[in-house]
Amino acid sequence: ISATPVTPNATESAIKLYSFLRENFGKKTISGMMTGDMSGYTMGADFKTHDDVKYTYTRTGKYPALVGLDFLFASGPKANESWNKEYTDKAISIAKGLWKAGGIPAFTWHWKDPLDKKDAFYIQSAANGGEYTDFDFSTGFKPGTTEWNTESAAYKGIVADIDHIADYFLELQKEGVAGIFRPLHEAGGKWFWWSINSGEQFAALYRLVYDRMVKVKGVKNMIWVYNPEGSTVTSWDPGSEYYDVLSIDIYNSANDHSSNASAFDKFKNASKSTKIIALSENGPIPDVNNMHTDEAVWSWWMPWYSTWSGTWPGQTKDGVWKSNMNDERIITLEDMPGWDKYTAIIKPDTSTTSIATMPRMAGTATTVGIFDMNGHYLGITTQGLPQGHYVVRRKIQGNIVNTVYFKK
């Protein structure tokens, strides 16, 4: 598993978050909870007052370390209506408060019709008689290829929506907040418009989301997730350089707390053990004892919400909730170290490393970070550090350069 996230020049916060996920993967599992209804949450209030977050505390006496948030109302023909905008603003408010408290925001995007013709993301066969979209993103390609036709209406609509969501991430980035982003989720499932075409076409769409956000908009604070159905894990893969985490959504029957080891092993093998593996949506939680017995220790789990009449968190037995949230192998919010205190463990990129003695440092405004020789992040200045060798990471004319200095 890579020591650094796939995003080039990731923010310090993103590096810390990725390092935390990597450090604990296979040893401990991060507890999560999805949010749904925002009507009971007051803008700017403590995220712990959200009904879905409170649910976990009421059942267990502990808060989840990871909280799921959705851009469900951030795009589509009604995105600019006050209620919809308020929903998204509340989600961003929760993300900020959660990060400040040492937690992890995890974003999903139920992406509505990019042409804004329908306020829907489901295709007709999955809409259960409700509103659906017939948007076909393949109309954004040049005929017979997966090369984008930048003059097409489909491409322009897709890019406009991507840019809009990217702006929310950039707002968080300015405040030092990082998060997890799971775009185009449940890839290969025949219910969302982004999965109606081929795996090759899906992969091109995923790469467009990543490239537009990271390389054009400058989003550097997200940990990226590829979330396919089990049958499409390899055939729809956008490329390992586009995601940090491989995840699956599994909804067992109520009170079924099995580890889902077969899915874990399938995804681990598909990634050749090079990716963090997560259970990004679930009903009942996998019992921690089962996970460790079966050697299927998910990076995190996240039951879907209890609000909006959601029944999923209630599908976990009371005793299992309590025993798991009080087990040292499950990470709750109370167990989180605090991002200001956490030291990232990364391996310096020696391909751009030069050797020099430590002079009086100039241009400190360009310094990205100081690391010890084992890759531990130490801060942005060598002041107060003892004599020895350090890796100084600097941004020079837009490029990141690592230099090994000896401080006398």
Q: What is each stretch, according to the model?
A:
Residues 29-33, 64-71, 104-109, 179-183, ...:
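Structural recognition of the beta-strand scaffold that forms the well-ordered cores
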Residues 72, 76-208, 215, 219:
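Substrate-binding cleft of extracellular glycoside hydrolase catalytic domains
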Residues 16, 47-56, 89-93, 164-168, ...:
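Alpha-helical scaffolding within the catalytic cores
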Residues 231-290, 313-350:
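Glycoside hydrolase catalytic-domain groove-lining segments
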Residues 32-34, 182-184, 188, 206-233, ...:
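Aromatic-lined carbohydrate-recognition surfaces of secreted/lumenal glycan-active proteins
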Residues 1-88, 96, 288-291, 327-350, ...:
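N-terminal module-boundary/linker segments of secreted carbohydrate-active enzymes
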Residues 36-38, 72-75, 111-114, 185-189, ...:
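Solvent-exposed loop/turn segments at secondary-structure junctions
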